[in-house]
Amino acid sequence: MSNISFDLAITSPLKRAKETAEILLEGRKIPLLEDERLAEMGFGCLEGYYCKGEKMNIPDPKFHYFYDDPACYQAPDGGESFKELLKRAKGFLADLCEKKAYENKTILLSTHGAMLRALLDTVKGIGVEQFWDSGVQKNCAVSVIEIKDGIAKVIEEGVIYYDDEVEDW
């Protein structure tokens, strides 16, 4: 991605996304802004548990709705629902589409799995019922959204620029 001329970068304030953006921008004089709306979906009292695969250790038997039926998923105490996540994504995208300062700019966004899915699904008009239908992208997968005349369109989704032997989360 070193051949892409970014005008600006916006990152989640969470460490993993911020460090990824800093690595991609290393040696470039590109502003890096933090935006809380790009943070990962909040899991409240379930933060820190593994939520997928053999390591899954979430004690709530209803958590399977998170992947199997997002419309029925109920956020844990202090957590965030899919509707809340999608609302955050929609607000962020509205700002990208409407702010003149972002017009005709190439902007790097560094975020997290569920938020990225929310951004892409919002652009494609997909609701909570089909939230995961396009799958979970691999870590550091690249998606491209183009905004023209205030309308967002997904151009590429889930492109990998590294050896694909990295373990899925």
Question: Model-found features: residue ranges?
Answer:
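Phosphate-coordination/substrate-recognition cap region in phosphate-metabolizing enzymes
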Residues: M1-H64
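Glycine-rich phosphate-binding loop signature in dinucleotide/nucleotide-binding domains
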Residues: S2-S5, L96-K105
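Short beta-strand scaffold positions
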Residues: T11-S12, K87, S110-T111
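Amphipathic, non-transmembrane alpha-helical scaffold segments
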Residues: L14, F82-K90
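Active-site catalytic microenvironments for nucleophilic, acid-base chemistry
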Residues: I23, G27, D95, K99, ...
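Acidic, low-complexity terminal tails and accessory targeting/binding regions
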Residues: M41-K55, Y102-K105, D121-W169
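Short glycine/proline- and acidic residue-enriched helix-loop micro-motifs
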Residues: K62-E84
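GST superfamily/GST-like fold recognition
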Residues: G113-R117
